[in-house]
Amino acid sequence: MPANIKIALDCRDINIATTGTHTYLSELITAFNKQHNNQVSFVFIKPFIGVMPGNNAFAKLIRHFQFIFYKQITVPVLTLINGASVLICTDYVAPVFTPGFKSIVVFHDAFFWEYPLHYSALWLRMFKAAALAGAKKSIAVIAPSEYAKKQIALHTGINPDHIKVVYEAPKTFAPIKSQTNPQSLAQISAPYFLHVGTLAKHKNLPLLIEAFSKLDKHFKLVLVGGAPSSVHNNDVPNIMAAIQKHYLQNQVILTGYLSNADVANWYANAIGYVFPSYNEGFGLPVLEAMRYKLPIIAANNSCLPEIAQAGALYFDPSNANQLAVQMQAIVNNTPAIIASLNAQPAVLQQFSWDKVAASFVAIALDGLKNASKHA
């Protein structure tokens, strides 16, 4: 094993993704830049050209080809040219051919296997084949929680011993210097509950709207985020139907995708954060909400109790009445809410992007050491 290890990071999603994987990459790049030393250095790999625009069948076909070519040809070549010993891919897919280097691949969850109807069948078949082939060649598959590790192993057949848990951390928001966002100023005159995330089916937002309808009418509900890229996973029609069913057109605010500064503005002024998802791989917004000292109500399933711990109150995500009771607890500032807020600083201390970066480096070095033993 060489004295100086160079680690390559595939940064394709930094210019393509708009939500979770973009945040993951940007925070990891920042953290890796702090890790440079005499033993470890980093190189950041990006595509030479952008993706094919358009939503017609031809454009989608070209994008599929671009993705395969980039992952299986461009990335290995750039990794070799840059002299990296390890390549990290944070978007499920690592190259199958890794001459002269080892790979680490991140699986954020097992949704592609758990919810196949939420994706295009042809694209999903190609994507899963590429993901599993790359994972098989990797020195480790990274999962963001113990729950995600269990689900990935269950649904993909990857050996659990090959899956390493590396917890994520909250997004770094710039300090809010002033409350000058026109949209926010126009819409936050009433106290509001907040949810941040894509308007996807597993987010369970119609149930949140139903629960919200049971509260006093002077509150508002703000849903920050846009529709997911997959039309098969788009829950906007059901969300709009729930809003109309409960006559909440003037109380539920859908902001669409926002800049980090605007998202921070919504966090800073909310009275509470609600996370009703059926399933999450990590549940990053609960930590973001803790950064803003918000009381949190989260579903009692998947990874959410593992991540939020005592820093949130929980409910059955199939029970709107139970959720409404917990939201009312925020309004009443009950002892349980106060206790959860007091627990949040200790929870937050467990998660940082510096720890994430250090874990990746340790896994890379350990993988190289084990590979040299078996060479």
Predicted segments with their positions:
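Carbohydrate transferase catalytic cores enriched for Leloir-type hexosyltransferases
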Residues: 1-375
